[in-house]
């Protein structure tokens, strides 16, 4: 469905080659994450030079996990009928829950091989992820996807003109859920950045990321129109978000009870 008639999802057209805004935004988010990851790694007593080699493993694993999750968990009825679309990731369809799973598996294999501390690096990744997600959600805006149910009149009146026009589908203004999640991710990043600067115990930042992001995702998912369902009316993304948020709470309690490591603040 054409969501933004006034925005072309293709940024640059060179002959048969189309460079889409979605791809530009995702690549920009990844590049910023790698750069910031080096700075945050140094703060945690890690080698910033390791970030590049880690990213070479983590980024493809995350993208692969995001795509596999989108195709085989969320949208298999569609892709089973359109197998030619499976590899067309530039058209959208990268699920963050799959990216986290794919990245976690790759990190769990790669970091011990390089004798690197898993949870310290998890904190670095957990810190940059919400910022990358906040940026990446604007790829949904340009790619004309991830909008919600019809918005109430009071909200429509508060929307700036460009957003109201962009969210109008068949004469009805829809919830800009991509924007809600982008803002929530920015708030999550801000909270985690404060925790990072306070040198909280190893594992706390990543655990809080799981809790905060997934709590917001659980709420926002309830009004999205592109949700996938299982067992009748249970939204897959909400179920996964609930499980990951609970996992985050368990990990958070565990890390807070552990003795502080070198480089942690002993008081938190």
UniProtKB/Swiss-Prot annotation:
It is found in: Cell membrane. Keywords: Cell membrane, Membrane, Transferase, Transmembrane, Transmembrane helix. It is a multi-pass membrane protein. Pfam families: LGT. GO terms for cellular component: plasma membrane. PROSITE patterns: LGT. InterPro entries: Lgt. The chain crosses the membrane at residues 21-41, 54-74, 93-113, 122-142, 173-193, 203-223, 236-256. GO terms for biological process: lipoprotein biosynthetic process. Pathway: Protein modification; lipoprotein biosynthesis (diacylglyceryl transfer). It comes from the Bacteria. A 1,2-diacyl-sn-glycero-3-phospho-(1'-sn-glycerol) binds at residue 137. Coiled coil: none annotated. Its EC number is 2.5.1.145. One of its GO terms (molecular function) is phosphatidylglycerol-prolipoprotein diacylglyceryl transferase activity. The keyword NADP does not apply. Catalyzes the transfer of the diacylglyceryl group from phosphatidylglycerol to the sulfhydryl group of the N-terminal cysteine of a prolipoprotein, the first step in the formation of mature lipoproteins. Belongs to the Lgt family. PANTHER family: PHOSPHATIDYLGLYCEROL--PROLIPOPROTEIN DIACYLGLYCERYL TRANSFERASE, PROLIPOPROTEIN DIACYLGLYCERYL TRANSFERASE. This is Phosphatidylglycerol--prolipoprotein diacylglyceryl transferase.
């Amino acid at each position: 469905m054409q969501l933004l008639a006034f925005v072309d999802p293709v940024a640059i057209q060179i002959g048969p080659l189309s460079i889409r805004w979605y791809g530009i935004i995702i690549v920009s988010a990844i590049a910023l994450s790698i750069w910031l990851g080096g700075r945050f790694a140094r703060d945690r007593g890690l080698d910033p030079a390791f970030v590049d080699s880690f990213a070479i493993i983590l980024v493809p694993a995350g993208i692969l996990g995001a795509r596999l999750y989108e195709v085989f968990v969320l949208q298999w009825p569609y892709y089973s009928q359109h197998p030619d679309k499976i590899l067309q990731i530039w058209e959208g369809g990268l699920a963050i829950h799959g990216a986290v799973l794919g990245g976690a598996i790759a990190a769990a294999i790669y970091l011990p091989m390089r004798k690197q501390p898993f949870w310290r690096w998890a904190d670095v990744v957990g810190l940059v992820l919400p910022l990358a997600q906040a940026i990446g959600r604007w790829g949904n805006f340009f790619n004309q996807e991830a909008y919600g149910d019809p918005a109430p009149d009071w909200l429509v009146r508060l929307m700036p003109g460009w957003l109201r026009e962009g969210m109008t589908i068949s004469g009805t203004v829809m919830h800009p859920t991509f924007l809600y999640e982008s803002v929530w991710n920015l708030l999550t990043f801000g909270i985690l950045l404060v925790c990072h600067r306070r040198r909280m115990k190893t594992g706390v930042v990543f655990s809080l990321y799981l809790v905060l992001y997934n709590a917001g995702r659980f709420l926002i998912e309830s009004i999205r129109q592109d949700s996938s369902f299982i067992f009748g009316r249970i939204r897959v993304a909400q179920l996964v978000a609930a499980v990951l948020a609970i996992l985050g709470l368990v990990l958070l309690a565990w890390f807070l009870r552990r003795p502080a490591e070198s480089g942690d603040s002993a008081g938190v």
